[in-house]
């Protein structure tokens, strides 16, 4: 049996731009992608903390060190510049590997810099 588990999460990032006239996707600072192990073209779930919207798209790497989180295409209708979002990637893990699976979580500051990098989400944590 296989299970779908959270593989990586970018928590409390601020939307820097919403570009309706782009083909689609989310552009994310490549340094942040590297830190959590997300890759270009990876399918991700976006959760908008401001309005409760949840949707899926794929990643485009952005300029390193820029702090960019730009929602492109139709997804731009679901966010506004300044909204707080969570970006989540998932992995399909065989049952026998679940105990060894360790997701990475980047907690972002107000400038989209990694404030804390956590391996495996702690239980009962309020962030």
From Swiss-Prot:
Q: Which InterPro entries does the entry mention?
A: Asp_de-COase-like_dom_sf, Asp_decarbox
> According to its record, what are the GO cellular component terms?
cytosol
Which SUPFAM superfamilies does the record match to this protein?
ADC-like
Q: Which GO terms describe its biological process?
A: alanine biosynthetic process; pantothenate biosynthetic process
Enzyme class comes to: lyase
Query: What residues does substrate bind to?
Result: 57, 73-75
Q: Which Gene3D superfamilies match?
A: 2.40.40.20
Pyruvic acid (Ser) PTM sites in chain numbering:
25
Lineage top rank: taxon: Bacteria
Q: What is its main location?
A: cytoplasm
**Catalytic activity entry:** L-aspartate + H(+) = beta-alanine + CO2
UniProt entry keywords in alphabetical sequence: Autocatalytic cleavage, Cytoplasm, Decarboxylase, Lyase, Pantothenate biosynthesis, Pyruvate, Schiff base, Zymogen
Pfam families of this UniProt entry?
Asp_decarbox
Q: Give the residues annotated as coiled coil.
A: none
Q: What is the stated purpose of this protein?
A: Catalyzes the pyruvoyl-dependent decarboxylation of aspartate to produce beta-alanine.
Complexes and interactors:
Heterooctamer of four alpha and four beta subunits.
What name does UniProt use for this protein? Aspartate 1-decarboxylase
Q: Which gene encodes it?
A: panD
């Amino acid at each position: 049996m296989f299970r779908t588990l959270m593989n990586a999460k970018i928590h409390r990032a601020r939307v820097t731009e919403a570009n309706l006239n782009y083909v689609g996707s989310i552009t994310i600072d490549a340094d942040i992608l590297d830190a959590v192990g997300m890759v270009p073209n990876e399918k991700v779930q976006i959760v908008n903390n401001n309005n409760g919207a949840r949707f899926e798209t794929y990643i485009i790497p952005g300029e390193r060190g820029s702090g960019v989180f730009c929602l492109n295409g139709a997804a731009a209708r679901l966010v506004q510049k300044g909204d707080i979002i969570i970006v989540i990637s998932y992995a399909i893990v065989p049952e026998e590997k679940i105990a060894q699976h360790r997701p990475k979580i980047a907690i972002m500051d107000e400038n989209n810099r990694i404030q804390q990098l956590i391996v495996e989400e702690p239980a009962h944590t309020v962030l």
